[in-house]
């Protein structure tokens, strides 16, 4: 009898153990099912036309993300893509990654969000981004852990009521003497830095990032060489600058879609901080690479080029991006933005350069002539202008800055005559004065990388030239 009872007891314990294991397995399966992507809709890849992937049978919205079936070395390695357009039954996608390994008829799955809507990528926002380097999709590039963020946003463009903008009245101290004294910038202004390659653009940007009085700095490195991205972070910006900065990088070798996303994401981050009453400095290097990425996609979609290979849509894309920055009366924060524009030869013939100059609130021109002389920063004062400067400085500084530019222009236009001794003193009063104080003018315009010149000191230095 005892043996029978013992047997029943053993069987009961065994059944309880099996039941507990069964419940554990169910819980495990439920957990694994919850982690599966919500994918219920898929189409088939029928064509690859340049950058564009053409899919049939896919019912999804523009901006939503998809997974494309891919096989590499016999293993599945699906890649992410985004819907950018459609025509009839065809849907057009652009991949975020290299498309090597994609095959005809590959299945293209539409991602579905938890609310059963099409999946649109949400990007991290918040103070946790400071000191981090991310790509255009919010993924870390600095080999640090993923960001545990409280806030997120989708990339979207929207128009801002012009009556919600506040006039620019406050000076922004950039720490650069030539800019503070002669091209004074206001908080909330939009400025372009026009430069060809190799004349100190990155160094000037680094000085602006390090010395400008701003709460938060957002830097978008669009289409730059990978080496330059690392060099800018480590050697030009430095650890002190990085600690109050967010860097969004999309190097030259990534998808044009990622470059566009990076530019928009950086602007989103700047908008988040200004809405939280922060004064934000947004630096985008470069606007030209952003325009080139837009051109690649537009031409692949079949748009016709209208000017220097650029389609007509570029003339709305650039203003849409730039106009999201500024100063607004509903918030105490602001976004002051610097956009670099690459120029080669006659920049007036370049549609991006021409458009940027018309949209921005001023431009700083860098000169190869000055750079070749070892004159840094290589700012061409004659060709540069700050459109809000007359409204934010006193009459004395404005008069001195205007006269300074006249002296420089007169000297540069007669440099050859001066150098060969052909100029006769007394012929031109302005030129006589320029020759007399030229060493002082040159000294004012030049500044070491490690030297900071605040706004008041810059104004004092300008005043001393004419005493």
From Swiss-Prot:
UniProt-listed InterPro entries: AAA+_ATPase, ATPase_alpha/beta_chains, ATPase_F1/V1/A1_a/bsu_nucl-bd, ATPase_T3SS_FliI/YscN, P-loop_NTPase, T3SS_ATPase_C
Family: Belongs to the ATPase alpha/beta chains family.
The organism's taxonomic lineage, starting at the top: Bacteria, Pseudomonadati, Pseudomonadota, Gammaproteobacteria, Enterobacterales
Protein name: Flagellum-specific ATP synthase
UniProt entry keywords in alphabetical sequence: ATP synthesis, ATP-binding, Bacterial flagellum biogenesis, Bacterial flagellum protein export, Cytoplasm, Hydrogen ion transport, Ion transport, Nucleotide-binding, Protein transport, Translocase, Transport
Entry GO terms, CC: cytoplasm; type III protein secretion system complex
UniProt-listed PANTHER family: ATP SYNTHASE (PTHR15184), FLAGELLUM-SPECIFIC ATP SYNTHASE (PTHR15184:SF81)
Family annotation (SMART domains): AAA (SM00382)
Domain of life: Bacteria
UniProt-listed GO biological process terms: bacterial-type flagellum organization; protein secretion by the type III secretion system
Catalyzed reactions per annotation: ATP + H2O + 4 H(+)(in) = ADP + phosphate + 5 H(+)(out)
Compartment list: Cytoplasm
UniProt function note: Probable catalytic subunit of a protein translocase for flagellum-specific export, or a proton translocase involved in local circuits at the flagellum. May be involved in a specialized protein export pathway that proceeds without signal peptide cleavage.
Keyword Nucleotide-binding: yes
EC number assigned by the record: 7.1.2.2
Alphabetized GO MF terms: ATP binding; ATP hydrolysis activity; proton-transporting ATP synthase activity, rotational mechanism
Residues the entry annotates as binding ATP: 195-202
């Amino acid at each position: 009898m005892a043996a029978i009872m013992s047997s029943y007891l053993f069987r009961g314990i065994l059944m309880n153990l099996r039941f507990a294991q069964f419940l554990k397995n169910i819980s495990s399966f439920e957990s694994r099912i919850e982690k599966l992507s919500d994918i219920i809709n898929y189409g088939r890849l029928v064509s690859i036309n340049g950058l564009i992937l053409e899919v049939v049978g896919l019912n999804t919205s523009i901006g939503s993300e998809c997974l494309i079936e891919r096989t590499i070395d016999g293993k599945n390695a699906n890649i992410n893509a985004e819907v950018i357009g459609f025509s009839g039954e065809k849907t057009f996608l652009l991949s975020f990654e290299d498309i090597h390994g994609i095959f005809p008829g590959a299945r293209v799955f539409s991602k579905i969000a938890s609310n059963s809507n099409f999946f649109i990528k949400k990007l991290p926002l918040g103070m946790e981004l400071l000191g981090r380097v991310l790509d255009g999709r919010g993924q870390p590039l600095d080999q640090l852990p993923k960001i545990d963020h409280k806030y997120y946003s989708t990339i979207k463009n929207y128009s801002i009521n012009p009556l919600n903008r506040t006039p620019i009245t406050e000076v922004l101290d950039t720490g650069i003497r030539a800019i503070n004294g002669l091209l004074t910038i206001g908080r909330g202004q939009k400025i372009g830095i026009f430069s060809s390659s190799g004349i100190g653009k990155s160094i000037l940007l680094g000085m602006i990032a390090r010395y400008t009085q701003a709460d938060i700095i957002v830097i978008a490195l669009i289409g730059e060489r990978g080496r330059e991205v690392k060099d800018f972070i480590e050697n030009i910006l430095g650890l002190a600058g990085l600690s109050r900065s967010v860097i969004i990088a999309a190097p030259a070798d990534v998808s044009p879609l990622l470059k566009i996303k990076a530019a928009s994401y950086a602007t989103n981050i700047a908008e988040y901080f200004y809405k939280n009453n922060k004064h934000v400095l947004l630096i985008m290097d470069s606007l030209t690479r952003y325009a080139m990425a837009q051109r690649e996609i537009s031409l692949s979609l079949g748009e016709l080029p209208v000017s220097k290979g650029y389609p007509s849509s570029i003339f709305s894309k650039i203003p849409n991006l730039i106009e999201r920055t500024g100063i607004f009366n509903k918030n105490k924060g602001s976004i002051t933005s610097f956009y670099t524009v690459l120029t080669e030869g006659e920049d007036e013939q370049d549609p991006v350069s021409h458009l940027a100059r018309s949209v921005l609130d001023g431009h700083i021109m860098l000169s190869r002539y000055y750079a070749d002389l070892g004159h840094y920063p290589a700012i061409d004062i004659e060709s540069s202008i700050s459109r809000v400067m007359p409204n934010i400085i006193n009459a004395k500084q404005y008069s001195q800055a205007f006269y300074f530019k006249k002296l420089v222009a007169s000297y540069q236009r007669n440099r050859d005559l001066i150098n060969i001794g052909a100029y006769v003193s007394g012929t031109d009063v302005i030129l006589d004065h320029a020759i007399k104080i030229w060493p002082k003018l040159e000294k004012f315009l030049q500044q070491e990388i490690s030297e900071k010149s605040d706004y008041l000191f810059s104004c004092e230095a300008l005043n001393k030239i004419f005493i």
